[in-house]
Amino acid sequence: MTTNYSAQEITVLKDLEPVQIRPGMYTDTTRPNHLAQEVIDNSVDEALAGFATKIEVILHPDQSIEVTDNGRGMPVDIHPTEGVSGVEVILTKLHAGGKFSNKNYEFAGGLHGVGISVVNALSERVDIQVKRNGEIYKIAFENGSKVEELEIIGTCGRRTTGTIVHFKPNPKYFDSAKFSVSRLRHLLRAKAVLCSGLEIKFIDKVNNTQDIWLYEDGLSDYLIEAVNGFETLPKKPFVGEFKGANEAVSWALLWLPEGGELIGESYVNLIPTIQGGTHVNGLRQGLLDAIREFCEFRNLLPRGVKLTADDIWDRCSYILSLKMQDAQFAGQTKERLSSRQSAVFVSGVLKDAFSLWLNQNVQDAEKLAEIAISSAQRRLRAAKKVVRKKLVSGPALPGKLADCGSQDLEKTELFLVEGDSAGGSAKQARDREYQAILPLRGKILNTWEVSPDQVLGSTEIHDIAVALGIDPDSNDLSQLRYGKVCILADADSDGLHIATLLCALFLRHFPKLVQDGHVYVAMPPLYRIDLNKEVFYALDENEKEAILDRLKNKKGKPNVQRFKGLGEMNPSQLRETTMDPNTRRLVQLTYDLGEDQGSDTLELMDMLLAKKRSEDRKNWLQAKGDQVDLSV
């Protein structure tokens, strides 16, 4: 390692180099299926916009894929600032495309992923043909670099338009260079289901098979076929759709009262969100609100029984498709939606639609209510078997602890909240059934070098240990009182300091909690942005600028509010941004137990927190200080 840290040591990655050096940051490197999905998404976006009616996908024996659509065709004119053709910009520049405004696409799935430029970067060769303006154009790339200039190779009818993308992934970037045919077929069929009237043909030249999908009533037919053979409630799926100003949602739902293999698929702009997200949370909440209202209106609930989302969700099979502008995903591979507004939109639409359906189909509705109530009663019986620590069975619980009612470790959460004022807001914002609040007064003790027998000398840490029901440095979690421990501190530097000290406490003195995945850090927003009737929350300066950039084409002037601390938020804001499972952001505290990674983590923490290593910290700050992100 060099001791001189100068400009010569700084590496600047250009064009597609970041993708080729760190492919795992941009795509799934297990198999190249995600590359195919990116190309297919571009064609499907043309269908969503009303310009394409047919898509053909061919898997060749050499494990290359060819995707053809009859959309508008990629732009071939010269880009005004880049000085090269539009198709070349799209293939060679990260974050380039026609979907960053709503002029070309009302809804688009291709905007928020890695884009076709990453397909180019990770492929041995990419050949593009474009039919546009009555002419056929061709351009080719190898390993991300252009090898054939854009040229006209023929003519076609002026109304004949479209794009052909033929690419062969580079095997060195993937664990297996072979496409998963089953996943590819499932993806294509789902696209056809979700985009009524779109014909999709899949030609598998490896296995010599061919499929054609065209659905006019896609969601209902697809769900019925998926649960074929099982008893369903209702007999025909509960289906519906609704289109708002900037969002549209469609769904199909069935319940399997006698059990069976449940189907749960969600999509955003026809992109499969395998890990769900805020739109699925909204679906759960909408169903819960409607069934609760139905049961209360008809006096169906036994005394002491309160329904939760899991009670109505337990045997539900669903297909959910959301189309929205400015969708935000967690990660480049778009497997989880994180847009907060989608939860509110979907839950509101589903609550109204499901309430109407319940009251129009009373016989089926009462059977559903019976299933949900039975689930709730089973849950309550199971909870009674878990005995909470009482005053007579151990140390008295901290007086400032606002405990929750449930004993279900799958759902209970303890929030460690910075400051009494924020603790007061959190107590009002919480779900009393599942969420407990323990306010902390100021910065806790730095316990990194404190011995286990002395760590409980700190009142704050003693309260944390008693509230959790476990002793420091113990591997016995049998008396653990909460399934999640959530650190909730301000988004400023002081809050980050407190969160760091708490993370150090758990890593050093409660390592079993961390290893078993019980510790989380809440991510409260630093900014609130209001424009007309829309509200957005930004985690940091970069996210604020990204939101403002998206809003600059909308009418009105955004109002930006910076939260100085959690105490500034009213309970409803705190709940929406930080405590509501449907809309909050939580980051799980983990560290790799592997021999190298685990020791590296502990070494870094020791350097940052040990009092005797001030000189090491000074040297580290001198070397890394230019990377700091300061909010002044």
Curated annotation (Swiss-Prot):
Keywords per UniProt: ATP-binding, DNA-binding, Isomerase, Magnesium, Metal-binding, Nucleotide-binding, Topoisomerase
Sites marked Interaction with DNA: 443, 446, 497, 617
GO molecular function: ATP binding; DNA binding; DNA topoisomerase type II (double strand cut, ATP-hydrolyzing) activity; metal ion binding
Cofactor remark from the record: Binds two Mg(2+) per subunit. The magnesium ions form salt bridges with both the protein and the DNA. Can also accept other divalent metal cations, such as Mn(2+) or Ca(2+).
EC number from the UniProt entry: 5.6.2.2
Enzyme class: isomerase
InterPro entries xrefs: DNA_gyrase_B_C, HATPase_C_sf, Ribosomal_Su5_D2-typ_SF, Ribsml_uS5_D2-typ_fold_subgr, Topo_IIA, Topo_IIA-like_dom_sf, Topo_IIA_B_C, Topo_IIA_bsu_dom2
Reaction it catalyzes: ATP-dependent breakage, passage and rejoining of double-stranded DNA
Lineage top rank: taxon: Bacteria
SUPFAM superfamilies in the record: ATPase domain of HSP90 chaperone/DNA topoisomerase II/histidine kinase, Ribosomal protein S5 domain 2-like, Type II DNA topoisomerase
NCBIfam families per UniProt: parE_Gneg
Described purpose of this protein according to its UniProt entry: Topoisomerase IV is essential for chromosome segregation. It relaxes supercoiled DNA. Performs the decatenation events required during the replication of a circular DNA molecule.
Sequence similarity: Belongs to the type II topoisomerase family. ParE type 1 subfamily.
Protein name: DNA topoisomerase 4 subunit B
Species in which this protein is naturally found: Haemophilus influenzae (strain ATCC 51907 / DSM 11121 / KW20 / Rd)
